[in-house]
Structure formats: structure tokens, C-alpha cells
Amino acid sequence: MTSSADLTNLKELLSLYKSLRFSDSAAIEKYNSLVEWGTSTYWKIGVQKVANVETSISDYYDEVKNKPFNIDPGYYIFLPVYFGSVFIYSKGKNMVELGSGNSFQIPDDMRSVCNKVLDGDNGIDFLRFVLLNNRWIMEDAISKYQSPVNIFKLASEYGLNIPNYLEIEIEEDTLFDDELYSIIERSFDDNFPKISISYIKLGELRRQVVDFFKFSFMYIESIKVDRIGDNIFIPSVITKSGKKILVKDVDHLIRSKVREHTFVKVKKKNTFSILYDYDGNGTETRGEVIKRIIDTIGRDYYVNGKYFSKVGSAGLKQLTNKLNINECTTVDELVDEINKSGTVKRKIKTQSAFDLSRECLGYPEADFITLVNNMRFKIENCKVVNFNIENTNCLNNPSIETIYGNFNQFVSIFNIVTDVKKRLFE
């Protein structure tokens, strides 16, 4: 007889199986462990373990229409498709980036709200979100039982950002051309840049997507950063005429291999241009591009997830958190605070600045040492004043790439620790 615990496991296995295409590595690992349990318990359960699943939503969206076409009579819901990084929140109860399958940590309150929306309709396959400038907006909701409008209303009541949408009855065959596209796009009337329009005919599940645009090439004068939050900066690509080309995040910049004083391919919309999301031309490896872009942005910044952050006092905050002492705003305050604790003072004395700084940032030791062994440092008065990576091949390791993107912060913390050691023990 099947126990209640077994039924719980089987229900979870079924739920994970249905949302595999939207799963991250943790969910896949959980799924595989349940498959292994089910196979050993029941011998045959009808599903198999998987190695990796690329996040895809192609079953729910038709091919993009980029030329005028006739739209049939009927009742339609039109939705904006926003510029930004696309994420899927599904029954696996995790936020997964479309295409890469990478999971993304969201605030607990947002996760709770997403779960409430999912729990309110068993027919929801997934919620589609867009992240731009560190802001989330729910872009679509796929349900077998109801239109996205009803789900948007519920999500809005819970405090999520939802799109403006348009409900229209089309009474006769109508040409969907640039003029109609522009009318619908303007009706959405919000501040998020829109790259296309999707629509659903009443009674149908699949979305149709319309994207009228032109390709162009623009000359890049500079690569800068724009502040979008508390110590959060997004890459900004500026043309020779001073216009700004929209960039999703740091990875978008890297993939496109943008370089100052060269031309880049863009998608031109009515009111803005988008950095074309493709693996840019040229022979540069990803590692070489990362090095060049970080050098261009400058040593005052480090890669912080999808964006940049300024080194500033962030190192002091992380160091005080690691040492479990009161927050300090200057090195003088830090020295005074350390002197209050014999345990902390002994830790500073016995542990190298190198190891303490690495631990403070949580870098894996083996990957960190591999990176450092491929770098050359300029040291003055025991502090790092400059560094250069001599072999970018090691950046093919995603973990090492992350550490390198964050390395300016490591240098800041290392120099603080070095300064503190001098003041305490010399």
C-alpha cells in the first residue's frame, strides 16, 4: 500500500516533471533524486532522469511576424513584450532565466506573491516576467483555464507590476501593418520600452508575436554606466551623435562584443534602438571581451550579478559582516571596532590578507587560486595598485569568470585588510 509520504513524493515528482522545461539545476537535481527514489520503490514509474533542460516556451508562442499580415475577425487581447531579461516562474516555485536555465534569487515577499498567484489557478503553466533596470514586471501568464487578464488583476492586488493590455473586438479582416502596430503600442502607455506586441485570440492558448523593426549599424563613441538604484549601475552604450542604445545587462554587453569607436548592429524601433542580441562579430573570446569591458568601465566598478556596482564603501560593509562586528564607514572606525574584540584581533593577526579577503567574498578557493595564478599584480606598500590578467582562457570557467568580474571589489577589501593589519600590529 502506498504511504502518505510516498504520495507526497509522487505528487512532487509529477509537478516537477510538468515544469521541467522551466527548471533550474536545483529543481532538476530534486527531480532526478525523486526519479531514483521512485524507480527503486516502484520499479517502473514512466519517467526518466534528465541531464540538462534548456528553458523554452516555444510551445506557447508562434513564430514572430515581422511583415504586415491580415488578422481575422474575433475578440483579442493585446499585450506588450518588454525589453529586458526574460524569466519564467513556474510550478517548480523558482525564477528561471529563459534560454540559459539559470535560477535567479528574488525577494521572499515576491516569491510568496508568485506562489499565491500560481496556487490560485491550477491551470497556470507559468508566469512570464521581464527584468530591466532592476525592476520586475509580469509580462504574461499562461493558463489553460482563463485569460491572462484575470491573472493580472490578481497579481496586481498582491502588489506585482503588471502590463497595460488592450482588449479589442475586430469585426472584419484587418491589415496589421506599421500604422496599427504603432496605435496599439502607444495605447499601452507605460515607461517600459517595448520590443514587440503579442496577442491572444479568445479561446486559443498560443500567443502570436508581432515585431516590426529595421536593422541598422551605429558608431559607438563610449561605454558608460547609468545609476538605476542604490549602488546599482546598468551598462550604457552611447553613439557618436549622443544617442543611447538600450542594453539589458552586463552579459548582453559581453555577448555582443561591443567595443568603443566601432560600429554595432542594432534593432531600430520607433523611439529607441536596441543592442542586437547576438554573439558579436570578431575573433575575441568571451574572456578577452570581459577583460576589455571591465578595463573600459574602470577599476571603480565590479560586476554585481546582472549589473555593475561601485567599489566605494561596499568592501567595508562586507568585511564587518564577515568579522561579525558593528558596521563601520572608515578604516579608523574599523580599527577601533576590532580592538574591542580579542578574538577578532587574533583572527586579523593570524590569517593572511589574501585568505581573509577571499573568504569575505565567498570565493571558491581552487577557482580563486587558478585565477590569481593567471594574473600579474603591481604591489606598492603591500597594497595592490594594479593588476592584469595574462591568460584569459581560465575565464572559460563560469565560476572564475564571476570572480574576475568581481575582482575590483576583492582588491578593495584586500587593501583595507592590509591597512588594518599595519595599524594594529606595526
UniProtKB/Swiss-Prot annotation:
Pfam family, one: Chordopox_A20R
Source species, domain of life: Viruses
Gene Ontology biological-process entries: DNA replication
Keywords in alphabetical order: DNA replication, Phosphoprotein
Database matches in InterPro entries: Chordopox_A20R (IPR010267)
Keyword Phosphoprotein part of the UniProt annotation: yes
Family membership: Belongs to the orthopoxvirus OPG148 family.
Function summary: Plays an essential role in viral DNA replication by acting as the polymerase processivity factor together with protein OPG116. Serves as a bridge which links the DNA polymerase OPG071 and the uracil DNA glycosylase.
Subunit annotation: Interacts with the DNA polymerase catalytic subunit OPG071. Interacts with UDG/OPG116. Component of the uracil-DNA glycosylase(UDG)-OPG148-polymerase complex; OPG148 and UDG form a heterodimeric processivity factor that associates with OPG071 to form the processive polymerase holoenzyme. Interacts with OPG117.
Name listed for the protein in its UniProt record: DNA polymerase processivity factor component OPG148
Gene source species: Variola virus (isolate Human/India/Ind3/1967)
